[in-house]
């Protein structure tokens, strides 16, 4: 039996900033049976173009297939894989943590400071903390505060850019 190694792949795509593009991209993944781990979309320095960052798990054949299929979509301008060591990848996470006592609040604030996060909301029974960083950093913070009681959590998914002078740009 052959053991095919699955890896996390981060794909960056420049697309036309118009209605229906994201639906066509997600439809492609659905039709092909590919699962999207996370997807983020945002406008670029050019208001007519958006950057879509997609995280998928799979072997290299799946990655190759995904990139080929994305390149066939009419509103997709350019697609590239962003390798972990050759890119900056970040995620934002908001976590509402149960902290009914001053001692619990103090503990959450201390953990947040160690992880260079921010307390963005404070109520009598909870705090909302903002943590930004790598997926591993966010997961480590979640594991640390889990025993205190996570009431609610929202993660943005990964967004990324290539390191150094390399840029993903439309063909001229």
Curated annotation (Swiss-Prot):
InterPro entries: Acetalactate_synth_ssu, Acetolactate_synth/TF_NikR_C, Acetolactate_synth_ssu_C, ACT-like_dom_sf, ACT_dom, AHAS_ACT, AHAS_small-like_ACT. Gene3D superfamilies: 3.30.70.260, ACT-like. Chain A, domain 2. It catalyses: 2 pyruvate + H(+) = (2S)-2-acetolactate + CO2. Coiled coil: none annotated. This is Probable acetolactate synthase small subunit. It is an enzyme of class 2 (transferase). One of its GO terms (cellular component) is cytosol. GO terms for biological process: isoleucine biosynthetic process; L-valine biosynthetic process. It comes from Methanocaldococcus jannaschii (strain ATCC 43067 / DSM 2661 / JAL-1 / JCM 10045 / NBRC 100440). Pathway: Amino-acid biosynthesis; L-isoleucine biosynthesis; L-isoleucine from 2-oxobutanoate: step 1/4; Amino-acid biosynthesis; L-valine biosynthesis; L-valine from pyruvate: step 1/4. Dimer of large and small chains. Belongs to the acetolactate synthase small subunit family. The keyword Ribonucleoprotein does not apply. GO terms for molecular function: acetolactate synthase activity; acetolactate synthase regulator activity. Pfam families: ACT_AHAS_ss, ALS_ss_C. Its EC number is 2.2.1.6. Residues 10-84 form the ACT domain. Keywords: Amino-acid biosynthesis, Branched-chain amino acid biosynthesis, Transferase.
